[in-house]
Amino acid sequence: MVRYVPTLGFCWMLLWVSTACAPLYNEPEVLSEHGYRVSLHVSDTLIFLGASGLNLPQASEVVVRVRDAQGQPVDGLPVVFSAEPSWAQNVSFTPAEAHTRNGEARTIFGANTTGVVHIMARVDHVTREARITIQSRPSPAGGGE
């Protein structure tokens, strides 16, 4: 077991660096019914269950940005956040609906089970989608043997 500790430590470091350096997920802008440019941004596309005490994300911030034809932020539009129906009982959005302020509507996504979920944000008859992976908390290095 002792000879595996450095290898496990190295693997943990690679995991930490890869998630810390992962870029934000950004959907390209699309035009809405009223000509607004709508985009979706996700802070973490990989989150972990029960990772408290570790430097691993347990939730993801989801941001919808809405701009007019001149690129100015659009305020006051309702944005509804949701997940595919099979995940409805296993995820949360806080809040589930928000209005744009300074051109942005934000929510915090969380889940209570592992897997891959497609999330959606709907604004002005446009739906933007993203995929978030939820994994179990990694086992501590050297644990169990």
List PLM regions with ranges:
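Short, hydrophobic beta-strand segments
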Residues: 105-113
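Sec-dependent bacterial lipoprotein signal peptides
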Residues: 1-20
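Short, conserved secondary-structure segments in the cores of folded domains
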Residues: 50, 95-96, 107
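Hydrophobic beta-strand segments
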Residues: 78-81
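Short S/T/G/P-enriched beta-strand
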Residues: 21-74, 85-91, 113, 122-145
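Short, intrinsically disordered, low-complexity terminal segments
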Residues: 17-19, 95, 118, 127
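Short, acidic Ser/Thr/Gly-rich low-complexity loop/linker segments typical of extracellular
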Residues: 94-102
